[in-house]
Amino acid sequence: MVEAVYRCFKCGREVKLDLSITRDLRCPYCGSKILYKPRPKVPRRVKAI
């Protein structure tokens, strides 16, 4: 079971989808096909060269 958290671009809700059961990526609330993975809130530090 592969469950991933996505955020809908249209309504902004977080959606948990099980990708092993279905390949259809749609928001169950508004029906939008545009979903993206939210970034973590931890700031990243990159050492400059």
Curated annotation (Swiss-Prot):
Q: Name the residues that bind Zn(2+).
A: 11, 27, 30
Q: What is its EC number?
A: 2.7.7.6
Q: Does the keyword Cytoplasm apply?
A: yes
The UniProt keyword set, sorted, is:
Cytoplasm, DNA-directed RNA polymerase, Metal-binding, Nucleotidyltransferase, Transcription, Transferase, Zinc
Write down the chemical reaction(s) this protein catalyses: RNA(n) + a ribonucleoside 5'-triphosphate = RNA(n+1) + diphosphate
Q: Which SMART domains match?
A: RPOLCX
Example GO molecular function term?
Answer: zinc ion binding
| Cofactor entry | Zn(2+)
Entry note: cofactor: Binds 1 zinc ion.
| Keyword match Lipoprotein | no
How it assembles, according to the record, is: Part of the RNA polymerase complex.
Q: Which family does it belong to?
A: Belongs to the archaeal Rpo12/eukaryotic RPC10 RNA polymerase subunit family.
- NCBIfam families referenced in this protein's UniProt entry, alphabetically: PRK00398.1-4
Q: What does this protein do?
A: DNA-dependent RNA polymerase (RNAP) catalyzes the transcription of DNA into RNA using the four ribonucleoside triphosphates as substrates.
Q: What is this protein called?
A: DNA-directed RNA polymerase subunit Rpo12
Q: Which organism is it from?
A: Pyrococcus furiosus (strain ATCC 43587 / DSM 3638 / JCM 8422 / Vc1)
The gene for this chain is rpo12
